[in-house]
Amino acid sequence: MSDKLKQFKWLIVLFLFLLAIPSYFTYNYFRQSSTLKEAFEKNERIEVLHRLMASEKYAPDIRKAGYVVPPDEAIRLDGVIYPLEIEGDLHLKISPPKKDAKDFQLFFITQVNEKQTHVAFILDKNLNLIDSSYSQQNDNGKREIISVSQSEEAYLLKSVQSEIDAFMKKMYQTLYG
């Protein structure tokens, strides 16, 4: 009788252990999802970008919202979504921010002085410009750094900010209805 009771106790312990494993993963999944929603609601753009781009988990949702991400195989290979493309007026290409980053980078091509110009911006969490770089091909076919007027840079920054804000709103709507 005591052996059967001992066996029964071991079965209960084993059952509880096996139940704990999927419970842990389910809890983690929903905790991550709620963390993303909190980041959206607190307007923490860098945290939102990090969580959206950190794996292939949100790639189908990003595609559903109408944005461009690499194929799932490339995301699995790279470990992140790189780049996230917002096909607006500027066709932004956003690099995935690192965890706990204070800034993020984006790239786009535009026309400055009627020449194709490659632009790189580094923005902070409030989408303020930290640094920028502008380059054009010279007559020899080499890229050279150029400077742009303050008004041109302000115009480009405002366009970038509005496209990122529109992306954030659309992604929130797509994910949380």
Spell out what each predicted region is:
Residues 82-177:
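Extracytoplasmic electrostatic interaction patches
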Residues 7-12, 47, 102, 114:
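Intrinsically disordered, low-complexity segments enriched in glycine/proline and serine/threonine
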Residues 22-100:
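N-terminal export/targeting and maturation segments
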Residues 8, 34, 43, 55-57, ...:
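Short, flexible coil/linker elements and helix-boundary hinge sites characteristic
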Residues 10-25:
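Hydrophobic membrane-insertion alpha-helices, especially the h-region
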Residues 1-7:
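Short, Lys/Arg-rich N-terminal segment immediately upstream of the first membrane anchor
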